[in-house]
């Protein structure tokens, strides 16, 4: 989760949820009586319209402040539904539902922020890894870090590479790649970068991404842009490259843990649990290292109030376990669903029976 703006003296925090986990955190933070602001599309009537014809209004973007009456999870989509009455904006006094999805900013205003709510937002924010963007073209590389306040260009690498007919072109390109890779490794270590996106025009970006993977064992996501330099970095951000890189890495992490789950099941290892009853028991013992919950199972639990699933998540969080809401859009998520929609890797085995 990204904290966009925070002013506790004025009682508000503006956030940008980036994953389903972030929606889970917000579900526990937003409560009845809070005031939530969001940019919504709402039908606005034209008061100047002729009275002879009925004006149904046109849907326009409006910034609304809604006094919360209820918060629920949409059963058929990965989104929160925040229901309430409009206090700020057109048609004050009308009921409205703010649908919160990943990538949608909301401002939460409370009379008083409880410590547990601040800690939950801080926890969600800390789980947001830094992303490095690299715009590359022949002999020119620009490196940027995506920070909370925006893009920070941290390095530029230039190297004289001969034209296509130059005899030393290939050798000089390799020298350039090595120099750029050295900078990437140095900055990634300093910044704690987990995701790298390489973009640029032409084929150089793909060649460099392959070089990083084969020569330096550094995985990178590739994005096509119309330009290199800082303009290329900005273009990557506008095209949603950061969000895609984080999501792809998240799926890779889910797959890694699920592979380990099935590996332990196959070996008869007792440091694994699956199914609601077993996972709840493991959570109560404080034995869970990683808890994996299928997104469909999680939605159903929130909508239908399936306490065993919600308690397994709550107890796992309290004991420092990593909790992942797993997409069932990929094969391994489907396999998790076959295990009852919930599984856990354990720190230690728990008593049976």
Curated annotation (Swiss-Prot):
Entry-linked SMART domains: eRF1_1 (SM01194)
Keyword Membrane set for record: no
The keyword Cytoplasm is annotated on this UniProt entry: yes
InterPro entries (UniProt xref): eFR1_2_sf (IPR042226), eRF1_1_Pelota (IPR005140), eRF1_2 (IPR005141), eRF1_3 (IPR005142), Pelota/DOM34_N (IPR038069), Pelota_arc (IPR023521), Ribosomal_eL30-like_sf (IPR029064), Transl-rel_pelota (IPR004405)
Needed co-factor(s): a divalent metal cation
Record-level GO cellular component terms: cytoplasm
Pfam families named in the record: eRF1_1 (PF03463), eRF1_2 (PF03464), eRF1_3 (PF03465)
Gene Ontology biological process terms, A to Z: nonfunctional rRNA decay; nuclear-transcribed mRNA catabolic process, no-go decay; nuclear-transcribed mRNA catabolic process, non-stop decay; ribosome disassembly; RNA surveillance
Subcellular location: Cytoplasm
EC class: hydrolase
Entry comment, domain topic: The N-terminal domain has the RNA-binding Sm fold. It harbors the endoribonuclease activity.
Family assignment from sequence similarity: Belongs to the eukaryotic release factor 1 family. Pelota subfamily.
Function: May function in recognizing stalled ribosomes, interact with stem-loop structures in stalled mRNA molecules, and effect endonucleolytic cleavage of the mRNA. May play a role in the release non-functional ribosomes and degradation of damaged mRNAs. Has endoribonuclease activity.
Protein name: Protein pelota homolog
